[in-house]
A protein has these predicted regions:
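Hydrophobic alpha-helical segments embedded in the membrane of multi-pass proteins
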Residues: 32-42, 62, 94, 116, ...
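Transmembrane helix-bundle core of multi-pass membrane transporters
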Residues: 111, 115-203, 232, 255-257, ...
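Loop-to-transmembrane alpha-helix initiation sites
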Residues: 107-109, 135-136, 181-189, 230, ...
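Alpha-helical transmembrane segments within multi-pass membrane transporters and channels
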Residues: 75-116, 290-291, 295
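Helix-loop-helix "hairpin" substructures at the membrane interface of multi-pass membrane proteins
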Residues: 77, 81-82, 91-96, 100, ...
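Transmembrane alpha-helical segments in multi-pass inner-membrane proteins
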Residues: 234-235, 241, 251-317
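Single transmembrane alpha-helix segments in multi-pass membrane proteins
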Residues: 7-14, 22-74, 78, 98-105, ...
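Cytosolic-side transmembrane-helix boundaries in multi-pass membrane proteins
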Residues: 1-9, 221-228, 298-338
Length: 338
């Protein structure tokens, strides 16, 4: 939270007059933050449980194609294609989890392999069926679909219409508000942050997650179903990646085989900046949410200040390194005090 406040203050000073903190600008950086936050929260839950998922980014590309190809080339209703994509996500997540639990292999290795498998399969299948790496034409299928609106409809439009009528926010030349509503990614992000925080803080399953990541053997000895907990968390990261993919595919109106590249690293970085330990057993969903908010704000802040956007990656790496050093320092001090 402190880091997020400092970032807001900094860009309030250097970019306050650029439109970054107008209604439209705020929605822009909230949208970027929310998209990252959706997968960062799931990555944080898995990290608290003591594991990593490096296949999140590839799952985003794979899920997008699982929506686009059936809908465009096989004639499926869009809602059926979305359900198919989520079904495949559950299958991939379960496969990752069962491999880690049953073989004892490090999740780093298992999911790194899945990263290549999913990305390669996405490229090969898409080229085989379509002859290219992008699948356009989804936008016309969104209207009247009973499921797509959950991922593709801005909310609270009436609020922005009213604000525009009162001249409280920027308007287009035709008199309509520049900011038309809250993006679906923001709603999903807030909902996931609230639900996962409640799970971690208030439920037995949340206690199991902390126990599984903190001391797997000890948790097993007291009856915690560590294997099932870890498998469910891998399913969670795959499903979160599919939520991300569905929102992006329906917003862009097309699927791209390379979508989601390196997003797994950004998600892990946001979770670490939010306080998750790389060793497991400690962290929070709300911390990961603030980590994503920091990265989203910096990403758009760099754009608004006309700084070369390549510097965002430098910031990403520096923030993660500082967070890891700080987290290890705090952990060492806590251990010494005991």
């Amino acid at each position: 939270l402190g880091g997020a406040i400092l970032v807001f203050i900094f860009f309030g000073i250097v970019a306050g007059d650029t439109g970054m903190f107008s209604a439209y600008g705020v929605l822009n950086f909230l949208d970027v933050s929310a998209n990252l936050g959706i997968i960062a929260i799931a990555a944080a839950m898995l990290m608290i449980g003591g594991e990593f998922d490096l296949s999140i980014g590839s799952m985003i590309g794979f899920a997008g194609i699982c929506i686009a190809i059936p809908a465009i080339y096989w004639g499926w209703p869009l809602w059926m294609s979305i359900i198919f994509a989520f079904s495949m996500a559950i299958l991939v997540g379960y496969f990752n989890g069962i491999l880690v639990v049953k073989t004892g292999l490090p999740s780093f290795i298992v999911t790194l392999a899945m990263l290549f498998i999913l990305r390669g399969a996405t490229l090969a299948i898409t080229r085989l069926i379509t002859g290219r790496t992008q699948v356009p034409g989804l936008r016309v299928l969104i209207e009247d679909d009973p499921l797509a609106w959950i991922f593709a409809t801005d909310t609270f439009k009436w609020v922005f219409t009213w604000l525009g009528s009162m001249n409280l926010i920027a308007l287009r030349t035709d008199g309509t508000p520049l900011a038309t509503g809250i993006p679906p990614s923001v709603i999903w992000f807030i909902a996931l942050a609230i639900i996962t925080t409640w799970i971690l803080m208030k439920t037995r399953y949340g206690n199991w997650i902390f126990a599984s990541g903190g001391d797997k053997n000890g948790a097993n000895n007291v009856g915690v179903p560590v294997g099932r907990v870890k498998i469910s968390l891998f399913i969670g990261t795959a499903v979160a990646a599919t939520i991300f993919a569905t929102i992006q595919v329906l917003d862009a109106g097309s699927a791209d085989t390379m979508r989601g590249t390196l997003k797994e690293l950004e998600a892990i970085a946001a979770a670490v900046v939010g306080g998750c330990l790389l060793t497991g057993g400690y962290g929070s969903a709300i911390g990961a949410a603030f980590g994503a908010l920091i990265f989203g704000t910096v990403s758009m802040g760099i754009f608004y200040t006309d700084v070369d956007t390549d510097w965002f990656k430098v910031f990403l790496g520096a923030m993660m390194l500082i967070a890891v050093i700080f987290n290890n320092y705090i952990r060492r001090k806590v251990t010494e005090s005991k």
